[in-house]
């Protein structure tokens, strides 16, 4: 379990899913994608509940992104929400498709920070005059 996990159940045995896994799972994904070198499909998992989180997984090399806990917590509209957010994030990066984003930032921490920063400027609806 991540050392930073502050939940009262942090020491319990059993499964762990969702937000606590996002950063460590993205780091492992980046390493796997680096070793795979396009020879196999890599699936980004762990803590994805927003477009920026999915984008970070793609930036480190994910071919696919799995939704699990996020889908359970946010409901069946989550995939459509994430797709709309991904479109805005790609536009902010000057990209027209996800294939162009795949593997562009192989360092997990940098990819996470980039995706988060973009989400703060591009996903928030802009006020109209």
Give the role of each language-model region.
Residues 17-21, 43-47, 68-71:
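Glycine- and other small-residue-rich loops at beta-strand/loop junctions that grip anionic moieties
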Residues 48, 54-81:
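Glycine-rich phosphate-binding active-site loops on the catalytic face of alpha/beta enzymes
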Residues 38-52:
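Glycine-rich beta-to-alpha transition loops that act as phosphate-gripper elements at the mouths
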Residues 25-28, 53, 78, 82-86:
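A general structural detector for well-ordered alpha-helical segments in enzyme core domains, enriched
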Residues 1-38, 74:
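Glycine/Thr-rich beta-alpha phosphate-binding loop at enzyme active sites
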Residues 31, 35, 60, 81, ...:
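Alpha-helical structural signal in soluble globular domains
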Residues 1-9, 52-61:
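A glycine-rich, aromatic-flanked flexible loop/lid motif
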Residues 22, 84-129:
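Extended, intrinsically disordered, low-complexity segments
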């Amino acid at each position: 379990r991540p050392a930073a996990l502050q939940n009262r159940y942090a020491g319990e045995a059993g499964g762990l899913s969702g937000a606590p896994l996002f950063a460590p799972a993205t780091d492992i994904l980046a390493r796997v994608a680096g070793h795979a070198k396009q020879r196999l499909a890599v699936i980004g998992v762990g803590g994805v509940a927003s477009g920026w989180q999915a984008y970070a997984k793609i930036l480190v090399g994910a071919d696919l992104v799995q939704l699990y806990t996020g889908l359970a917590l946010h409901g069946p509209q989550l995939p459509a929400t994430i797709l709309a957010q991904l479109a805005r994030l790609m536009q902010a990066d000057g990209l027209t498709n996800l294939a162009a984003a795949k593997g562009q930032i192989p360092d997990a921490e940098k990819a996470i920070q980039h995706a988060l920063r973009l989400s703060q400027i591009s996903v928030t609806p802009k006020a109209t005059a």
